[in-house]
Every structure is written in structure tokens, then in C-alpha cells.
């Protein structure tokens, strides 16, 4: 009994604060580290340490719940356990944390806390020095009797168990091989005891007190096992395995230390999981799965890799909002005001949201619609989704789908794989905590496809109101109801969306803005936002509407306002520099006036030498407020204009016409240029054209050849056969951009008619429309975006197919007032509108007398 403990710990120890678990000397446990102080301790001390001493920590039990993670150091327990960190395992799911495997060495007492941040460090006094223990027994025989009594109860308890179990046999050998003074701590950590009882054993520095406290615990375990054997006599072999002794896997390299794989903290967590499963409102099928998994978890050693997977699965199941939802705000008037305040224009989109609210007032169990906002970048599709959630009073979650090429991102990974995780849909529901959020599926048109599956196909189940009430994630493997989720998708174009997915969504077009709308958006939203971000006030900067119009027309050319917002940011940064310099100059002038009187400033400026211009500039008067941003200031800040109205210059010779094109970025004007030369009747097409546009060019030249006599069109040799000894070259500028589609047909005909007639096309006319071989003009799409592009370019007359006349109702009235429209049903009408004075013919060509 007089052996001396050979362990010597440092006099200063970093403190690891635990909440419920208690580590006793000689035992081993795993603990999770996720608070700020403990994380900093692991990263600074364990991960960067190079010596054995750096792996020794002071474990302080019974500290306040680390979930609060307050800035102040909580009250610390007086006695702790010096521990050796054996293993550190890091993980980022569900949040960054480390799992430590630590072995208790000896007790210590805190003398003084030396520092609290970034992690506590204390001066400690080592206890458990057996030669220093005060012998409070009257004789040494009394301490020996306590030791023998403890040993007998320990042996009796172990012999009641199944000795065929390796862990039990190992424990029996330890009782004979380890010193008696080490057994109370080890046995207490193995048998089922509460944290309070463990804490009492830890506080018992005297060996006599530890024996006296541990013996009743052993007696209680023995009596419990006897009672269990009486009540379940037929299953005697199983009874020996049921005793609440944790499995002992191995003896560590430290004498008397045992590894405790399933510590009290884990058991408490399992009990909490069971309680959450019982009280949760999950469906019956999910509840059965959770009950089955929790039973498997109880029988599973913590060292098994599947232990963490099963535990994470159960934690996810109890955290999912199976029946938790928010109450919708169905005040249509308030919703209208909120939408108008957040977004200007977009009347069609706002009307659809208000319609949804109105129907919800009449029918509470309405399934969430599947909306898809389609429009060019920068028009506010994503922000509208956030405003819809705000209007309804729902939670909002954005899922970026651009570049996603694995269906597991949508449906989740099966739990058989290492590192499996739920899909983005289920993970988003866990994040928001309710089952009726607004989910924004951003950039749904940019989904990829790979060997891992097609995520667009996985979305079919999610976005189908008839199926998504029973959505099954591969990770959960049980059904989850998504029918209450309001899904909003965004896309730049519907061309790349699979037809099956497109069929499940309600398409709402979000066109680009007019110049007037951009001006309103700039002065209502963009400029105030930029002023706030740059610390400026309206008293320091003034941007007139004429300046805003100049930025829109000469420095940006887009359907949205994203580039416009960046230009305002550049202006605000330049003004911020002026304001900051002005404040510096005011302070410098004030100091100069105080030092030398009122005339000091003039004296300094008069005596300034040419090489000291910088000093004179420092003493110049600060700028007057507010700083006015005019055309000269724009040129200084943003540089020379990026875009000029060059339409008239480019149409100064025959063989050039202006068409209108639609792109995912919005509408734009497109020039078509033609040239002829001596040759063999070949047609050359350049400008990265698609097959459809090439066919339109061949249609145009064929129609003109068949009607050359009626329009008096000849080649350079005076022949009505336009390709006789003549080659034609058609070019579409912006050659790096791929172009395709049938809407350039009327533009190609007009361009070639100008080339062969030698007449100029009107410089204020743009056109769009598909042609047929018989000279008919067929309707095309994207009329609104094309008209807005022509308006931005300063064009005044637009030729569109007659069957597109209905699309003019979507054009804002202020744009209509600036433009005149010609609706054409055949190419005769197109040519008459494209040339000054019309395009005269000897006999008006009909639809039947054209010939090739």
C-alpha cells in the first residue's frame, strides 16, 4: 500500500472544460470538443505540439453547459484530472468539432487561473501522491481491511458475469495485477454510476474515503444483478451479459489505465435521443425506423465506424421539422405594399404572388405552386424570391444549382457509403426548421449531367405536386412531405431545361427593364444602398437623373441593373476619397489658422515652390458639398463612354441592315453586313452561325433571285441572276458569339436587297421575323426584350411579324410612345418600311407568281 505514483505532471496545465462527463484517473474516455475555448486549445496545443508534455491536459468536469459559450470563464470545479491526449479526430459535419480520446493520469487541484483567453491555463498542484495521503485510520490494519473488503466485492461482482466474455476475463485479471489503490477509480468508471457519484469519487482525495464511497456502489450492482437473475431465470447466460458494465477493450500503456469506449456522456446522449424520438411528431414509418436504429446503437461499440453514422442519422431524424410550420400572412393589401416597396415594375410577377395569397385565404390546404422565373441576369429574380418569403412570413432558403452534376446532391447519398450526407432539400429543411419554407432553386437551367446521374431527373420528384408529398431521400430512406414547400426556380433561358422538368413548372417571364424603369430603380434602391455601403449621405453627393440616364445609355448595355449598380459603386468610392481628403484638409487648415493666424494660409500658398505642389494641394480648400456628378465627373470617374450610338455611321453604305436578337442576357441589336464580288455564285456565311440561321440566309437569297426582275435587282454585270459570276459574303459581327435562330430572316433579305439595289436602309429601323420561301413573315419569340433593346439603342421604327402584334401589349406605354411599329405579313411590306420612299416594283409581287 505504500507504492509511490511515478507520474509527474507539469505545474501549469491548459484546462479542457467538460459539461457532464467525469474522467477518473486510470480510465479512458472519448469527449467531443465544439466550444470556442476547447477548439482553440486543441488547435494550438495538441495539433501544433511537438512534445509529450504538450499532450497533457487538465480536464475540469461539471462546468456550465458549453452550448452557451459565453465570453466570461464559467466557475471551475476545484479538483480535476490530468489527462493524456491519445487521439484527435476532426470532423466538419454537422458542425466543426474534434473528438478526443483521453486517458486519466492523476488528480490535481487548481491553485490559480493564469489566463482565460484564448483557452484557460492554470497553475495546479498534483494530488494522488500516495506517500503524502494523511492516514486518518486509527491503524494501518483498518485501511487494509477496507482494501480487502473492496477486493472481495469486486471479485464477487466479476464472478457473477459470464467469464467467457473477453472483457470480463480481462477485468478479472486486472483485479489481481493492479495496485489496490488504483482500483476504486477504475471500477467506478466501469460500473453504471451517475455523474454526481463520479464527481464525489473524484473529490475524494483520501484513499480511505474512496474505498468507503466505492464499496456501496459495488454492493448496489451485486444486488441488482441478483434481482435480475431471479426475475429472468430461464435466460441465465443472457443475464450475465446484461449487467451495466461497459466493455473494456484494451489496457493502455499507462499502468492502471483502462479505455472506456462508451462513457456516461454517450449513454446520456442516447437517452436524450430516445426521449426526442418518443416526443417527436414524425410519421409512424419514420418512428419505427428510429426505434430500430436506436436499439442497434445501444448494442454497438463506439469504436465501430457505423456508430457515428447511426448516431448522426438519428440526430438528423429528430431535428427534421416533420410537422412544424409557420403561419402564412395572408393580408393581400400589406403584401402588395411590401412587394411594391422591394421591387419596381414586375407587375406580372407580383400579380401571380397576390393570386396565390388570395387562393390561400379561400383554401388553407392548397399545395405550394412550382414557379419558375425566367429572365436575363440582374433583373431581380433571386431577390424577388426572398421578397415572396418575406411577404408570406415564411423562412427562406436558397439552393444554388449551377454546375451541380450529381443526383446525390438532390436525393442524398445512401448510408452505405463513407461520408454519406442528406441531399440539399432535406439539409435545407433542417436548416430552416420548418416544413413550409420558400425554397429558391437558383440557376435551374445550368444543371449538369455526369456519370453520377442526372440531377434534373432527380428534381422531377421534388417539383411534382402529385409526388412530392412522399419524397424519399436516399439518406433518410423514409418519406418526407414536401407539399407545403413553395418552390421557386430561376433560369436565364428555358432552352436548356429538360422538357419533363419544364412541364412541372409554371413559367413566369421576367423581362429586362426599360430606361425609365432603370432610372426609378437606381434612385429608389441602388443609389441609397451604395450610399449606405460607402458611408455617404445625400448631403455629400448628388446624382441627377440626367447623369443616371447617361450611365445607362453610354456606360452599360444590359437588360438588368447589375452593371449599373457597379457603376454607382465606383462613383461612390471616388466621392468617398474626396470627402475623406476634404475632412483631412479642413483639419489641417484649422491647425494652420490656430498656429499663424488668418493670413497664414495665403502665406504658405504664395511661398510654395513648383516642386511642392502636393503640399499646396493639401492646403487647398475642401470640396463644396454636395458633390454634383455631371457628365464631366462621369468621364473622370468612369473613363470615356463604353458605348456610342453608332447606328447611323454603320448604315452609311448599302448592304447593311439592323436586326433584333434575343439572348439569355436580354435583347440586343444585331447588324447584318453583305458584300458581293466576282466569283462562281457561292454564298459565304461568317459569324459563328448555327444551322437554322444558315438556312435562313439560303432562303433569303433564293427568294431574292426569284423576285429579282420585279424589284429590278441586278448583279454587277446587269444580270437578273444575282449569283451569275458573283459571290456573296454575309457577315454577322461579334464573331466570337454563337448565333442561331430563324428571326434574322427578314434582316438578311433587307440587307441583300440593299446590296443589289444600291439603296441605303433607314438608319432608325430594326426588324425581326422568320421568312418562308414564298415570302411570308412568320412570328418569332422574345418580342418585348427585342423592342427594349431597340429602344436602348435609340432606334425609332421597328418591323415585326403581324402575328406578333399581340405581344405589343406587354411593352410599357412610355416605350410605345417613343417607337413606331410596322406589322408585316409578307416581305413586300418589310422592304417598303425599311427603305425611304418604299421599295418600288414594276408589278407588285404576289405569293403565287414567285419562281426560283
UniProtKB/Swiss-Prot annotation:
Ranges for domain Lon proteolytic: 651-837
Biological function: ATP-dependent serine protease that mediates the selective degradation of misfolded and unassembled polypeptides in the peroxisomal matrix. Necessary for type 2 peroxisome targeting signal (PTS2)-containing protein processing and facilitates peroxisome matrix protein import. May indirectly regulate peroxisomal fatty acid beta-oxidation through degradation of the self-processed forms of TYSND1.
EC number: 3.4.21.53
GO cellular component, one term: peroxisome
Superkingdom of origin: Eukaryota
InterPro entries: AAA+_ATPase, ATPase_AAA_core, Lon_bac/euk-typ, Lon_lid, Lon_proteolytic, Lon_Prtase, Lon_prtase_N, Lon_prtase_N_sf
Catalyzed reaction equations: Hydrolysis of proteins in presence of ATP
An annotated Gene Ontology molecular function: protease binding
Binding site for ATP: 375-382
A biological process term (GO) from this entry: protein import into peroxisome matrix
Signal peptide (UniProt feature, chain positions): none
Oligomeric and partner information: Interacts with PEX5. Interacts with TYSND1. May interact with enzymes involved in beta-oxidation of fatty acids, including ACOX1/AOX.
Protein name from the UniProt record: Lon protease homolog 2, peroxisomal
Domain Lon N-terminal: 13-222
Keyword terms, alphabetized: Acetylation, ATP-binding, Hydrolase, Nucleotide-binding, Peroxisome, Protease, Serine protease
Short sequence motif Microbody targeting signal: positions: 850-852
Pfam families, per database record: AAA, Lon_C, Lon_lid, LON_substr_bdg
Homology family: Belongs to the peptidase S16 family.
